[in-house]
Amino acid sequence: MFDVLIYLFETYMHNEPEMLVDQDKITDDLADAGFYREDINNALNWLEVLADLQEGQKAPYLYTADPQALRIYTVEECRRLGAACRGFILFLEQIQVLQFDTREMVIDRIMALDSPEIDLEDLKWVVLMVLFNIPGYENAYKQMEELLFEVNDGYLH
């Protein structure tokens, strides 16, 4: 499913954000590209939930949390997000790429993936997808895009 999400993001969302797309056409295009229908449907559902989160239609508790609260990860979240990923999320909060609400969106979308464990590169892509359509997060998106595509110049995080 994650490969489908990356393909969709690079092909449709990132390159043509204003374009209205027909979900049936996208499904057919993805199937023609060699993706399995189940992965395609899971990816499209994942994106629908993300859109609902971004519009505040789901999980309104995300917007009522105290921004100074400390995030304690559940056992399942710790299994899925290793120490490097959790540290990177904290780093993104410290440099204000993520706020408490967008952090929770990222964690929600990570937990909805069908992967038992997420690596740092996958996490960066999910953060980029979450930030992509949120008004007011354009600078955070640009910063995250730079972090995703940066070549290792000795940058520590």
Swiss-Prot record:
Family affiliation: Belongs to the Smg family.
Protein name: Protein Smg
TM ranges: none
Disulfide bridge map: none
